């Protein structure tokens, strides 16, 4: 039974079903076979904090299996070898992946090419020579990349970046630091954003450029792995660029207009995190609904107690609203609208209600909700992270009110 009155295109619905089948065929069996490794944060990581070789081999296997099945690059522009599907397909596919994986979600992010880790519209703006060199490996899932924008002093306000691109002959030298660069501990390439015109950057009139840098380039260093929630490792890195040489062909997009390049990925990133929050929130509520019907206390199943079930009903209502908001934003984007307000609303609302849904599911489980075996605690951590990643809720509300004050008040 569907809870949505309007019909989605048949091919979009088929993508959701196909992704669910792929996850059940390729992702969940791998997780089950290696659960002792993947479910234990103490065993996932090598001594330097990166994923162990065993774990990274599984990640690469999933990427390559997805590429072979035709899913990994389905939303990559056709001009660079992808399927050319849009934001709605991206939203439906990712929600299906996370809803299906649920607590066994560790390999889920690699079932589809993430815009910052794999081929994306950003690579439409590199030279033909660079495309020919890097695209085959990225499209196949054998290699990956990362997105170096945030810095120690530049997070929500990316205009504060200090990394410099100093002209040298026909190329540049990059020097600076990056922080919170997801996938950087294992990436083969990094899109590095740097100040190329200090006066223009200071006046907020451009002056920032993007460059594609191999992570094995001289002077490019992963200084450390950023560790979160007490884990022994992580997937975010602190990077140092010390006089890294880049040639003109490594420029991504237009010189001094790097933020235009960055914005190519922002919409997809927010669609992704909206879908991820809804998928994981739905999984958590469904898990809690099953549990409260089985668990008894004081002679009755927990489902008989409104104090336990009403919060689940409220979260289901919120997730339904978030789902509709996400679909609407994706449809607007596919129609050619910028949907700045609508996507900001969808992402900020979805990650908040997704987090609260997991919190309520944990409470319904009592002590069991905190255990590694149930898996809700780690889902909570993921959703707590994406209340900050790809635009904090506060920044998104700032964006929403700016649009409203400019007259974009259609709701």
Language-model segments: what does each one mean?
Residues 160, 216-247:
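Flexible, small-/acidic-enriched active-site or ligand-binding loops
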Residues 153-156, 180-183, 201-202, 228-235:
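Short Gly/Pro-enriched turn/cap motifs at secondary-structure boundaries
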Residues 124-126, 166, 192-196, 212-214, ...:
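Short beta-strand-to-turn element immediately C-terminal to the catalytic PLP-Schiff-base lysine
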Residues 118-125, 199-200:
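Flexible, glycine-rich active-site loops centered on histidine and acidic residues
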Residues 141-149, 193:
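A short, Trp-centered hydrophobic/proline-enriched beta-strand micro-motif
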Residues 243-261:
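Long, acidic (Asp/Glu-rich), low-complexity accessory segments flanking structured domains
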Residues 175-223:
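A short core secondary-structure module
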């Amino acid at each position: 039974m569907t809870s949505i009155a309007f019909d989605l295109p048949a091919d979009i619905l088929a993508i959701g079903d196909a992704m669910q089948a792929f996850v059940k065929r390729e992702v969940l069996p791998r997780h089950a076979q290696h659960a002792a490794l993947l479910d234990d944060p103490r065993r996932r990581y090598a001594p330097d904090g990166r994923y162990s070789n065993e774990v990274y081999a599984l990640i690469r296997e999933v990427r390559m299996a997805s590429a072979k099945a035709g899913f990994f690059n389905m939303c990559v522009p056709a001009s660079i070898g992808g399927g050319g599907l849009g934001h709605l397909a991206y939203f439906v596919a990712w929600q299906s992946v996370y809803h299906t994986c649920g607590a066994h979600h560790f390999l889920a992010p690699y079932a589809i090419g993430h815009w910052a880790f794999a081929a994306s519209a950003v690579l439409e703006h590199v030279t033909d020579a660079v495309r020919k060199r890097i695209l085959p490996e990225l499209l196949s899932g054998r290699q990956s990349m990362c997105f170096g924008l945030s810095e120690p002093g530049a997070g929500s306000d990316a205009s504060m970046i200090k990394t410099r691109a100093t002209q040298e002959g026909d190329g540049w030298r990059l020097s600076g630091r990056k922080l919170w660069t997801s996938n950087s501990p294992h990436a083969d390439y990094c899109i590095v954003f740097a100040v190329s015109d200090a006066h223009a950057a200071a006046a907020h009139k451009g002056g920032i450029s993007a460059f594609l840098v191999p992570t094995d380039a001289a002077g490019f260093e992963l200084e450390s792995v950023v560790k979160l929630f007490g884990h022994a490792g992580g997937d975010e890195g602190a990077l140092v660029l010390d006089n890294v040489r880049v040639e003109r062909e490594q420029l991504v997009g237009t010189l001094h207009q790097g933020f235009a390049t960055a914005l190519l990925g922002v919409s997809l990133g927010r669609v992704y995190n909206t879908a991820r929050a809804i998928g994981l929130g739905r999984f958590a509520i469904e898990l809690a609904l099953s549990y409260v019907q089985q668990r008894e206390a004081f002679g009755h199943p927990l489902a008989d107690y409104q104090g336990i079930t009403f919060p689940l009903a409220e979260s289901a209502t919120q997730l339904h609203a978030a789902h509709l908001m996400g679909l609407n934003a994706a449809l607007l984007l596919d129609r050619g609208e910028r949907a700045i307000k609508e996507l900001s609303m969808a992402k900020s609302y979805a990650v908040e209600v997704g987090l609260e849904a997991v919190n309520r599911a944990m409470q319904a489980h009592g002590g069991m909700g905190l255990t590694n075996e149930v898996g809700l605690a780690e889902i909570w951590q993921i959703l707590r992270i994406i209340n900050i990643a790809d635009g904090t809720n506060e920044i998104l509300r700032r964006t929403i009110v700016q649009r409203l004050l400019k007259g974009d008040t259609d709701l």
